[in-house]
Amino acid sequence: MKRVAFVFTHAPHGNASGREGLDALLAVSALTEEIGVFFVGDGVLQLLPQQQPDQILMRNYIATFGVLPLYDIDCCYLCETSVRQRGLSIDTNWVLDVELLAPEAWRSKLASYHSILSF
């Protein structure tokens, strides 16, 4: 079966890429069981708890990340260096259970997927 990776690289709410990526992720989950979800750069901000997008008149789609385990999507990886570069604690209570990886391990894990979709 084909392994598909979704890579989130943009901050939430500034554009629609995070929401569109999440929609695509849920749609593809009906077609394949081997899905990996990767967060790097500003994409790590997608998983911050207690966001208030309504303050900037945006839809709150972040809570939808919490349903990924219901779709049997549990391979989620966060770049530890990206977290630290943004001044965030690695002990943050992310909205999704993620495995923090050093950049080399993160890239190695990503390389094991057949298709990579970036948002």
Swiss-Prot record:
GO cellular component, as recorded: cytoplasm
Keyword tRNA processing carried by entry: yes
Compartments where found: Cytoplasm
UniProt cross-references to InterPro entries, sorted A to Z: DsrEFH-like, Sulphur_relay_DsrE/F-like, Sulphur_relay_TusC, Sulphur_relay_TusC/DsrF
GO biological process: tRNA processing
Primary location recorded for the protein, binned into one broad class: cytoplasm
Keyword annotations from UniProtKB, A to Z: Cytoplasm, tRNA processing
UniProt keyword annotation of Ribonucleoprotein present: no
Annotated family: Belongs to the DsrF/TusC family.
Biological role stated in the UniProt entry: Part of a sulfur-relay system required for 2-thiolation of 5-methylaminomethyl-2-thiouridine (mnm(5)s(2)U) at tRNA wobble positions.
Assembly behavior: Heterohexamer, formed by a dimer of trimers. The hexameric TusBCD complex contains 2 copies each of TusB, TusC and TusD. The TusBCD complex interacts with TusE.
HAMAP family, per the entry: Thiourid_synth_C
The protein's name: Protein TusC
Species, as recorded: Pectobacterium carotovorum subsp. carotovorum (strain PC1)
Annotated gene: tusC
